[in-house]
A protein has these predicted regions:
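Short, hydrophobic beta-strand segments
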Residues: 2-8, 158-167, 220-228, 360-367, ...
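A carboxyl-terminal module marker
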Residues: 2, 20, 27, 435-437, ...
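Conserved mixed alpha/beta core segments that line enzyme active sites in large multi-domain catalysts
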Residues: 47-75, 240-241, 258-326
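Phosphate-backbone binding interfaces of nucleic-acid-interacting proteins
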Residues: 1-203, 337, 356, 360, ...
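Glycine/proline-enriched, intrinsically flexible loops and inter-domain linkers
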Residues: 5, 23, 28, 63, ...
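Extended, well-folded interaction surfaces typified by the phenylalanyl-tRNA synthetase beta subunit core
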Residues: 178, 409-572, 767-769, 774-775, ...
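Terminal amphipathic helices with adjacent charged low-complexity linkers/tails
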Residues: 183, 187-214, 389-416, 423, ...
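Mobile "lid/hinge" segments at catalytic clefts and subdomain interfaces of large enzymes
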Residues: 111-126, 130-136, 143, 149, ...
């Protein structure tokens, strides 16, 4: 955002110096990136008078001039065609730096004639592009500083330009008035009133406006009017100078007025040549195959649904982004239709990004302009057009209505002081909000329509702190810890998160940090995308919702890596996910993703594709690290983004500790990931903390007696899970059975041919560890019988013969 000091003073009655304004802006959060002060580079130049000029003896286009300066008469060789006796000029002496030619002058000889300095043109002093001759001043004293003469006679020539970096959450600061409002609230002046004098139309507009049903949500409000009999010549010097100062090229009065409003009041407008509009204007979605030759000279092929303003012949403008050349105004325009509308930000951002169009209008509409200023902006622009171009205005035509953005939040002065850490009196807090445009009703603050970023009590406090200046905060040392055993710095949950992160890295995963914001389509794939987690002022449409899961970010990272030739991936992320916008609807997860092979190619053939068991083993390893009990069960109550037959939950009763398995192929296709892909999610906070804190671990109690292992093979239904068999066998004798593990499975057509349709064989090893006495064969057989009985009752299976 660029503006000049004089432009700022059109809205702010202030005597503050440029440096004071720049410092205040940065302190307010409106970072000043650069200040271009022409006077700083012109300070050395003085006025002089040419007393005599004659032809150079050895050059047709050069003249030898005698110039009266504050140091006496000097000889200067000049090539300007207007160098002559009697004119007052701007003198650059030897030793002066001339910015336009990037040169420090010295005494030199030009074609054998000595020259002491130069008489400058406007381009050489970077005042304009004029270089056909040296500067001729109508008045001035010899020796007077050129900057003093400019300040008195042409102040716009040395008007400082301020370049400010505006953050996405402050669309109101994309207009000079919004910046002036912040400075006034800080106390650097008084905000001047903005006069809105409605123009009474003298006739009905022959061009009507409508909003098609398919565009109503994206285009809630459209206003316009016809102005006939205008003269569209060059704009006044003050307007041209203002636009040039911020890097814009003056075009014509009508176009320059719309550009002025864009930067002055953050109100983009558009003007149509009424003679080139056929019928009424309709805001609608583009049809497939339509195109538009825009004002930048490029033809854009529109997507179906892109928001356009169309007449009977087709699209005439890309709504909120850029007008069309066919209906653009020219020097011959006499009747103009002026448009002022409010467009929904996300739709503008999506269209602009898809068509790769950047414009000042798009930049503002996609961040959010003031919806309540749509009609007032039209009236104020109409008044300026009538003043500068003449003509007669019609009555306003209007479709839709400005969206209701009214909202109010309670101001708690005590909470403000608590959060900010500064003593800010209640009266000052209220005065600050009122200066920023908030309306106070008791302790409720009504948010102004131009501040879409204010969405809660915390934002009120932020505004108060910003205006009061956080630079006033006094540093306070932290209290010294008391003697003795120090208290833990991290909470139990934070320590658990750290342990989970370290274990994931130890398992070979690479940590990713992805955005917490994702697009609506990706959020919907993972059970999100509701209005409760929609971002009010997203940076882009690809960051419109809070993420419901960590998998979207990891899958997007996998897709980017695959596109760059990295096929074998092991990625993980630990971070928050959001199921809603209320307290308690934010949880912490650790999610890992495996794609490709388990290892690089080697001479031993150890490389194999990753599978669901890798994901399960890694999930169990992390759960074990953070203290999950070993008695967890596996169930199949899965979310829709998991493969229904190749995934499961690790749960403790109804409490889900982790999910592992293959990601659904439908999700992989939508995320452009080459599968299969396997993943796990550990719900870190769901793992119960130990009920009793023990300062030390119990001593390891090893038995001196010989352990015994026995193998069992059970014939069970194909749908029986191995964990069911393991848990049943484990419970046969908890005192003696130390562990049970699966070592073989026989399933498929061959298994069914031997054991019957729908059957499979699962083989387990049970390890028996006596504590009191050596086991006899009778003892072992008794335990084996219990194992067979328990498994039979749990699964309906039989011991395989």
């Amino acid at each position: 955002m660029k503006l000049t000091l004089s432009w700022l003073r059109d809205h702010l009655d202030t005597t503050a110096l440029l440096t004071e304004i720049a410092d205040a802006l940065t302190d307010l959060g409106l970072e000043v990136e650069d200040i271009h002060d022409p006077a700083a580079r012109l300070h050395a130049f003085t006025l002089a008078q040419v007393t005599h000029a004659e032809q150079h003896p050895d050059a047709d286009r050069l003249r030898v001039c005698r110039v009266m300066t504050d140091e006496g008469e000097k000889q200067i060789v000049c090539g300007a065609p207007n160098a002559r006796a009697g004119i007052t000029v701007v003198l650059a002496k030897p030793g002066d730096y001339v910015p336009g030619i990037d040169t420090t002058l010295g005494v030199g000889k030009i074609r054998g004639v000595e020259s002491h300095g130069m008489m400058a043109s406007e381009r050489e002093l970077e005042l304009s592009d004029e270089h056909n001759g040296i500067i001729e001043l109508p008045s001035g004293e010899v020796g007077q500083r050129f900057t003093d003469w400019l300040a008195a006679n042409a102040p716009e020539k040395i008007d400082p330009m301020i370049h400010i970096k505006i953050t996405p959450n402050r669309p109101d600061a994309l207009g000079v008035r919004g910046i002036a409002r912040d400075l006034a609230a800080r106390g650097l002046g008084t905000l001047k009133p903005l006069e809105i004098a409605p123009v009474e139309g003298g006739f009905d507009s022959p061009i009507g406006v409508t909003i098609a049903p398919d565009a109503a949500e994206r285009a809630p409000h459209f206003t316009g009017r016809l102005i006939r009999g205008v003269t569209n010549g060059p704009s006044p010097d003050w307007l041209q100078s203002r636009l040039r100062a911020i890097g814009l090229r003056p075009i014509s009065t009508l176009v320059d007025i719309t550009n002025l409003f864009t930067f002055d009041l953050n109100r983009p407008l558009h003007v149509f040549d009424a003679a080139r509009v056929h019928g009424d204007l309709t805001v609608r979605g583009a049809a497939a195959g339509e195109s538009l030759l825009a004002l930048d000279g490029k033809t854009y092929d529109l997507r179906a649904g892109d928001l356009v303003i169309a007449d009977a012949n087709g699209p005439e403008s890309l709504a909120g982004i850029m007008g069309g050349e066919a209906s653009g105004v020219t020097g011959a325009t006499t009747d103009v239709f002026l448009e002022s509308a409010y467009w929904q930000p996300i739709g503008i951002a999506a269209t602009g990004r898809a068509l790769k169009i950047n414009s000042d209008a798009r930049y503002r509409f996609e961040r959010g302009v003031d919806p309540a200023f749509t009609r007032d902006g039209l009236e104020r622009a109409t008044r300026m057009i009538l003043d500068l171009c003449g003509g007669e205005a019609s009555r306003v035509v209007e479709a839709g209505a400005a969206p209701d953005t009214s909202r109010a939040y309670r101001l708690d002065p005590a909470r403000t002081q608590s959060l900010v850490g500064m003593d800010i009196p209640e009266a000052q807090q209220r005065a600050t909000l009122e200066a920023l445009g908030f309306v106070m009703d008791g302790d409720m603050a009504q948010v102004p329509s131009w501040r879409p970023d204010v969405q809660g009590e915390a934002d009120l406090i932020e505004e108060i702190a910003r205006i009061a200046s956080l630079s006033r905060l006094q540093g306070k040392p932290l209290p010294r810890p008391r003697a003795g055993v120090p208290l833990p710095v991290l909470t139990p949950l934070q320590r658990r998160e750290g342990a989970a992160r370290r274990m994931a890295a130890a398992l070979g995963y690479n940590e990713c940090v992805t955005y917490s914001f994702i697009d609506e389509a990706s959020a919907a794939l993972f059970g999100g995308g509701s209005d409760a987690v929609r971002i009010e002022n997203p940076i882009s449409s690809e960051m419109s919702h809070l993420r419901p899961d960590l998998l979207p970010g990891l899958l997007a990272a996998a897709a980017r890596n695959q596109a760059r030739g990295f096929a074998d991936l092991a990625l993980f992320e630990l971070g928050p996910v959001f199921s809603g916008g209320e307290p308690g609807e934010q949880t912490v997860q650790l999610t890992g993703l495996l794609v490709g092979a388990s290892a690089p190619r080697d001479a031993f053939g150890s490389r194999r594709p990753v599978d669901v068991y890798d994901a399960k083993a890694d999930a169990e390893a992390i759960l074990s690290t953070i203290g999950a009990p070993a008695r967890a069960q596996v169930d199949r109550k899965l979310d829709g983004w998991w493969h229904p037959g190749r995934a499961g939950n690790i749960a403790l009763g109804p409490n889900r500790l982790a999910t592992f398995g293959e990601v659904h192929p439908r999700v992989l296709k939508a995320m452009d990931v080459k599968g299969p892909a396997f993943a796990f999610t550990v719900h870190v906070a769901n793992v119960p903390l130990p009920k009793v804190k023990t300062p030390t671990r119990p001593a390891l109690n090893l038995s001196d007696l010989q352990a015994v292992e026995r193998d069992f093979a059970f014939v069970v239904d194909a749908g029986v899970e191995a964990l069911t068999i393991v848990n049943a066998a484990q419970g046969a004798d908890k005192a003696l059975i130390e562990s049970v593990r699966v070592f073989d499975q026989f399933a498929g057509d061959k298994a069914e041919a031997q054991m019957g349709a729908g059957k499979k064989s699962v083989a387990i090893t049970a390890r028996l560890q006596p504590r009191d006495k050596t086991l006899t064969d009778k003892d072992i057989e008794a335990v084996a019988a219990k194992i067979v009985d328990k498994v039979a009752k749990a699964t309906g299976g039989t011991l395989r013969s």
